[in-house]
């Protein structure tokens, strides 16, 4: 896959100025985390404000971890999200009930676990591969083990887990993902993006 066609999602946004800078850089999607245990959590009230000026063709992705059905529906009703991203132990039945395109994040340790998720979540828009962690649900800064990704997966996958300006080109060249998802690798602190790191990340991919 040509690195110039890699789709890019910047996740864990909490500030309007960071979202605007990401848009100016040409990213494809913005991730908002609706999970109170996350340092990057945003309230519905704040989310309404910071997504206000996002233009067409930049997707808003709501990132959720084992949410209540009613909370997901509230987000759909209140925020103009294009995609839901489930980062917990949600079942395929739970994910599909909202009639909204969704991404299922998994934290696999083996190729078999990846293939099993692709089979189970057959109607997901994509599978997101993130680093296993006993403490955090994404945003750990730990690099995913690229060697366990099976060849010729039948579903598009998004590569996450410890991506930054130093390793992103190697990751793309080795893994050929449909898209990449970066969070801690472009931050000054959790939820606060570093604009220099953001621009360097993009430059590493697109030149």
UniProtKB/Swiss-Prot annotation:
InterPro entries attached to this UniProt entry: Aldolase_TIM, PRAI_dom, RibuloseP-bd_barrel, TrpF_fam
Write the Enzyme Commission number(s) for this entry: 5.3.1.24
Q: Which domain of life is it from?
A: Bacteria
User: In the UniProt record, does the keyword Cell membrane occur?
Assistant: no
What is a biological process (GO) this protein takes part in? L-tryptophan biosynthetic process
- Reactions the enzyme catalyzes: N-(5-phospho-beta-D-ribosyl)anthranilate = 1-(2-carboxyphenylamino)-1-deoxy-D-ribulose 5-phosphate
One of this protein's Pfam families, by short name?
A: PRAI
Tell me which family the UniProt entry assigns to this protein.
Belongs to the TrpF family.
What protein name applies here?
N-(5'-phosphoribosyl)anthranilate isomerase
Instruction: State the organism of origin.
Output: Legionella pneumophila (strain Paris)
